[in-house]
């Protein structure tokens, strides 16, 4: 969701609460439970899963490996669920022409620096940059170059769903709003 007026442009960012992250966290969790159940049933010698008789899988080495994969998958799945719960990467970009201030806010991982808040003046913005990489894994990222601070990404680096036209239009609108040039690299 975005909000725009004559002097203020606010762009809300979704973060890690995306449908794809929910899907992969569920798949990984269920698959890990399956691996762990197969490993446990081979250790106990009891048939915990009706599809696969436990007599066919020996505990050493197959059951140990299945248990290891199950535990590793549960750790990775818990990491995904934590990033979804904490909504890592969400936040907003606020461009205020009237006050001459740009604010960038993102939620990070819990800790001392959970809230990432950057604030600088509009006059310190040198340009809006577009990075385009075509090929098997195309990437189109929008950056803001700030005097003395380098470049700051405005779009997520994993968002490859922007068409060239969409990223150019977004860059042109933002550059016009802020009164800065566009660079492509």
UniProtKB/Swiss-Prot annotation:
Cleavable signal peptide: none
GO biological process, one term: photosynthesis
Pfam families linked: Ycf4
InterPro entries in UniProt: PSI_Ycf4_assembly
Membrane topology, record value: Multi-pass membrane protein
Cell location: Plastid, Chloroplast thylakoid membrane
GO cellular component: chloroplast thylakoid membrane; photosystem I
Top-rank lineage group of the source organism: Eukaryota
Keyword field: Chloroplast, Membrane, Photosynthesis, Plastid, Thylakoid, Transmembrane, Transmembrane helix
Main location: plastid
Transmembrane region(s): 20-40, 57-77
Family statement: Belongs to the Ycf4 family.
PANTHER family, A to Z: PHOTOSYSTEM I ASSEMBLY PROTEIN YCF4 (PTHR33288:SF4), PTHR33288
Known role: Seems to be required for the assembly of the photosystem I complex.
Protein name in the entry: Photosystem I assembly protein Ycf4
